[in-house]
Amino acid sequence: MRLQSLFASALTLGSCVAQNSTNGTWPIHNNGLTTQIEWDHYSMIVNGQRFFLWSGELHYWRIPVPELWVDVLQKIKAAGFNTFAIYTHWYFHNPNPETLDFENAAHDFTKIFDLAKELGMYVVFRPGPYVNAESNAGAFPLWLTTGAYGSLRNNDTRYTEAWTPFWEKVASIVAPYQLTNGGNVLTYQIENELGSQWRGTPSKKIPNLSSIQYMEALEASARAQGITIPFQANDPNLNSDSWSKDFYDGYGSVDIYGMDSYPACWTCNLTECDSTNGAYKPFNVIDYYDHFQEISPTQPSFLPEFQGGSFNPWGGPEGGCPENSPADFANLFYRNNVGQRVTAMSLYMLYGGTNWGWLAAPVVATSYDYSSPISENRMINDKYAETKLFGQFLRVAKDLTKTDRIGTNQTASTNPNIVYSEIRNPDTNGAFYVTIHQESTVGTREEFYINANTSKGEFTIPQKAAPIVLNGFQSKIIVTDFSFGSHSLLYSTAEVLSHSIVDEEDILALWMPTGEAGEFVVTGAKSGKVSSCGGCSSVGFYPQGDDLLVTISQSEGISILTFDDGLRVLVMDRSYAYEFWVPVLTADPFSPANETVFVQGPSLVRSVAYSSDGTILELTGDNNGTSTQIEVFPPKAVSEVTWNGQSIKTSKTDYGSLIGSLTAPALDSLTLPEISGWKANDSLPERLSTYDDSWWVDANHMNTSNPTKPETLPVLYIDDYGYHVGNHLWRGRFEGSASGVYLSVTGGRAFGYSAWLNGEFIGSYVGAAYPDTGELTLSFGNLASSNSTNILLVLQDNSGHDETSGALNPRGINNATLISSSAKNFTSWKVTGTAGKPDTAIDPVRGILSEGGLYAERLGWHLPGFDDSEWSSASPSNISSSAGVTFYRTTVPLAIPTGLDVAISFTLNASPSNAALRALLFVNGYQYGRFSPWIGNQIEFPVPPGILNYDGDNVIGLSVWRQEEGGESMGVDVGWKITEAFASSFEPIFDATYLQPGWTEERLQYA
């Protein structure tokens, strides 16, 4: 019946919407449930206004401290974004088939919706159920990975029954927060990068019914739970052409089509992207225009994931690869997208966060910094500042929301090395000339002019100033007929930064790279003057008919030009533009210009408000200098400025601004106490033959649902026994005098394992960055007993489940074969892992992904409140020469002064630097670092407030698994440091007790 209805709908709806508009107009679409959110060929239309969706991604589950969400979101808003995107995480909320958790601590994500409303941003909500995200099994619940639910992401009824409770609950939670219900959730994504609508070549449109029926079921379920906002989808690349109603109106297609792109590769291992992008070339731009014209011509060109950075795989470069997508990348690629008529774009990632616990897929380690504009430690960087310049421009460039592409790759009039795309608003005639190098991979310094068509004719610009310059891997957007408030620019070769209306008068901000020249024409102006020259030169005012042509060169600083009609124009270089802010007085995501204030100088401006009588301008934000100049451009009624609640002394300038100075403590004098006072205990008693494993799970399955069958029996796949993350322990028994064992163990990239027979170490697979399986033939020597039961312990690491179809790839022992044995096989196996019943978290606050199965973890040695008074003193700097696991623990107080936001990172340094060991860092019960110096890539581990107590005691734990016996001494030096500090209105000191549940006697049963 379902199949019949599918084909019936397809026949009724037809196959493809015409790609060209009729009668010069494009149809305006909605989903039939609301007209609050509509769209057409040009852009989205929200509450009747055209809208450039400018968004960035963050994951609340990668920053599991709800008190920190406001900090990150304030920084997103301050950079000019009007939207942010979030994934949910199925496993984080659904630890077993019977349990859904949307209440405990960070599991309750509704605070994010409240903050979006308060700050004035829309939300692109992406609930999966599969999300990828370099997360363990792509965020599938790991109980789903046994094969018992089929191959996943299809119409298999077993899989449908698995996702339905989670999917329905999420939709019911989100429904009240939709724009249509007074909230700010704008769109709702169905699945993630599921480019499988078609079988074979997409142009043949042979339906893939399994995927189609899956998508239709997800859509119907969400609608049944009250989701009325538009559905969106994100095609994984340019090749799969899936889920656009323009390409095929039916077969599960969604309301708004999108396509993801990572032109500089999503990983620091650039070869992984060759099959998608071709061989890597730095700064090689990609054409999207033709794709969107073919696949979604009556919809806005939408990039739901556009590169904000890239993740760092195991063995990658220390600190990631920010050089692959630096500030210049943001400058060039985001502008180039505008030149291709993209009017909806979300950066992945804008804030990456941390793969704490066992959140990560095997492709990535603890850090998920992603070289993002907002770093893992929540601090902003040069890429953030460069992105902010673009975002502030988008906020005021209203004509961008409706443009036609007039020409592309047009050569600059004087330099064939520069080309530009011209896009023009058909209603206002406002145009944007997006300039780039003819070969974007070439970053030479080039001077050029362009032929610009304006409402007053064609001009070769600039007319009087020095030529336009592209210096490096950059782009510039040259505007013509640019309207702002009651004014307009006929053109400008200096880039537009922002626009504010104060006391019903316009203030325009322009910027240019340090030392370059710009030229602009103010329509209707008769005269102008330099009211303040902060680094300006070659300033000229030239009447041109009814208009005024202005030339200026700008070194480091900010200059203010005033005009006879009341217009003020701020011209600044890049360095000053980086510290130029446009806070908004309203919670309207459109950020109207008459609700903004210009502020220059601080490291960050978080908010702005007026006192009730309008005489005090109240600013909050961050600054990091002992003396930082601040200049604000408020209404005339303002006579006082406060910064973070404190009045600052200001003086008024002739051109209407107020200038003052911000002070901050001497932040470079901040210090942290030494991490010392370590105590230690053996964390691997399971290696001993006397250890009692009677409570462990019997690993006795003789068959498995997993499509990959083991080479020996019983089945020793960890997920089949209800354990899924971290370290697992297998104990196999046999009788007789075997001489050795062959082991084949799978644990994902960068995993490892070690083995002991009757308490004695026999060998390790130390691991490598890419292999996910390790094979060893281990000799027992004279350790096996022919007269008693022998016990083999295998301690296995598990770096996570693979993504997409690889989620079913098993983890565990594929083959355990005794060698030269009088017994043919092991007589029995037992297994244990994370404390709690299988598939059940003992710690619902930190959640199912927080800890693995080490003895120390099971017994809660990493938790606050555990009594270590009987332990002996020992330092991880000099560990035992025996292979095994030792747990180290200490308590260190912190006393960060109030009024400061401080980023703290732990440092782990091995001796020797490539030591064959594996260490886990725990902070107040949270695992915040996986350290494998043999494999490499990370020695600094940021830990945020809320995990760390900034004003109180901190329990720090370190498990050290030595994988080699004897030889040179080994150790791990544990330190910490302040990486950045600011005087801030954000207060990182708060009561985090609820996030840090302590030790309980319940743990003792897992000894």
Curated annotation (Swiss-Prot):
The family database entries (SUPFAM superfamilies) matched by this protein are listed as:
(Trans)glycosidases, Beta-galactosidase LacA, domain 3, Galactose-binding domain-like, Glycosyl hydrolase domain
Q: Which residues form the signal peptide?
A: 1-18
Q: Which residues are glycosylated?
A: 20, 23, 155, 208, 269, 409, 453, 594, 624, 681, 703, 787, 815, 825, 878
Active site: which residues?
E193 (proton donor), E305 (nucleophile)
Listed under GO cellular component are: extracellular region
**What EC number is given for this enzyme?**
3.2.1.23
Gene Ontology molecular functions: beta-galactosidase activity
Query: What function does this protein fulfil?
Result: Cleaves beta-linked terminal galactosyl residues from gangliosides, glycoproteins, and glycosaminoglycans.
Protein's name according to its UniProt entry: Probable beta-galactosidase B
Q: Which organism is it from?
A: Botryotinia fuckeliana (strain B05.10) (Noble rot fungus)
What gene, per UniProt, encodes this protein? lacB
